[in-house]
């Protein structure tokens, strides 16, 4: 999770 997961997980 970096680009697409960034909106739900801000820690990564």
Curated annotation (Swiss-Prot):
<comment type="similarity">
    <text>Belongs to the universal ribosomal protein uS19 family.</text>
</comment>
<dbReference type="GO" id="GO:1990904">
    <property type="term" value="C:ribonucleoprotein complex"/>
</dbReference>
<keyword id="KW-0687">Ribonucleoprotein</keyword>
<protein>
    <recommendedName>
        <fullName>Small ribosomal subunit protein uS19</fullName>
    </recommendedName>
</protein>
<dbReference type="GO" id="GO:0005840">
    <property type="term" value="C:ribosome"/>
</dbReference>
<keyword id="KW-0689">Ribosomal protein</keyword>
<dbReference type="GO" id="GO:0019843">
    <property type="term" value="F:rRNA binding"/>
</dbReference>
<keyword id="KW-0699">rRNA-binding</keyword>
<comment type="function">
    <text>Protein S19 forms a complex with S13 that binds strongly to the 16S ribosomal RNA.</text>
</comment>
<keyword id="KW-0694">RNA-binding</keyword>
């Amino acid at each position: 999770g970096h680009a697409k997961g960034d909106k739900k997980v801000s820690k990564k």
